[in-house]
Amino acid sequence: MRNFKQAKRIVIKIGTSTLTTTDGVNSAYIRTLAAQVAYLRQLGKQVILVSSGAIGMGAKRLKLTGPVTDMKMRQACAAIGQPLLMHEYHKAFGEAGMIVSQVLLTAEVLNHRKSYLNLRNAIEQLLHLGIVPIINENDCVSTAEIGTAFGDNDKLSALVASKIDADLLIMLTDIDALYDKDPRKYKEAKPVHFVEEITEPLIKAAGGRGSAHGTGGMKTKLQAASIAS
């Protein structure tokens, strides 16, 4: 769908790098996001958020520096950061007159029909009640080793969008566009304004992980777009 006005159900994915700063959570950004979601709801849109940030916020609360790569430490950071993340959402969205809900997922939920249908029914009921569902991977228990991890929330957002019949998937990032090469490394990088086909050379040019505490980047966003389309 290319006509935004016709989109009724919208999934918005927010990455770690847009939610956090070097000092901690970006509260101003979350308030701005809340205002924008409130506006979309006034237009009759249903909005579902897929939010990263738990590991990053947990790491900052523990005053960790650099990427958190140890699995046990990532799980600990997620357990610490998830309630901090939801507190920020509750506060900002509450000030904008909205109620939010937390939905934590593992890959198992979407891979089994019964649990998937239970999830879908829950989200449908939340939307019916006018609640904004905020979905995140349950990083405290999701691990690639036991096959319960999505890998990144870009992929999760695409899967959620397809499973709940969303009309539009928006992925927010701190990079202003897709480039033909990493603009943080190459000054001559040029923006790619429209992608008709997701090719291997394009994915390769998109680079790797986006932030120290996140798992996504432009590469995973292209892969997510491929899933969603």
Spans of model-derived segments:
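Nucleotide/pyrophosphate-binding catalytic subdomain
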Residues: 1-229
